[in-house]
Amino acid sequence: GLRVSELCALNIESLQPNSTARVIGKGNKERVVPYGVPATRALMRYLIVRPMLAKKPTRALFLGVRGGRLDPRSMRDIVYRVAAQAGVPEISPHDLRHSAATHLLEGGSDLRTVQEILGHNSLATTQRYTHVSAERLRQTFTQAHPRA
């Protein structure tokens, strides 16, 4: 659920031992964002090879081909390329952020928690993600209710 700029700004020390990351978001506000087991495993594998990517010492977590901090444009290009290779065209990093929020809401998370994870100032901004959940509720009701 991170913004591309937040992901690119992560430093190694941003990762916490309890599978959370300390993220500096919009307005220089810090928040703690959890991540799951698959991300933890991927990060562990990445951290093993990361020293080979660094051309000089850097605190940056994600590195580009020249060994410096990966920039948001390069991150977007990577997402577009990997999505196309996977046969999922027209997907952006923001689509992934939107999907993460939607999955949290559909999984039963409350709106306030999702707001905190996404780093939104306003609950109204987070509410934009609820329309998909409402649609899913309607579909489930129609399919499951005997008199719908």
Where are these regions (language model features)?
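Short alpha-helical segment immediately N-terminal to, or the first helix within
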Residues: L10, H103-L104, I117, T140
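DNA/chromatin major-groove-contacting recognition/catalytic segments
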Residues: P38, R45, V132-A148
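Active-site/catalytic core of tyrosine-dependent DNA strand-transfer enzymes
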Residues: G36-V88
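Conserved tyrosine-mediated DNA breakage-rejoining catalytic core shared by Y-recombinases
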Residues: R3-I48, R59, A124
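Short, polar N-cap/turn motifs at the start of nucleic acid-interacting alpha helices
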Residues: S14-P17, D71, V88-E90, S109-R128, ...
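Hydrophobic packing within well-folded, soluble alpha/beta domains
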Residues: L7, Y35, L43, V79, ...
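A short, glycine-centered helix-capping/turn motif at helix boundaries
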Residues: G1-A9, G107-S109, H120
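Short, basic (Lys/Arg/His-rich) helix/loop patches that form interaction surfaces
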Residues: V33, G68, R76-E116
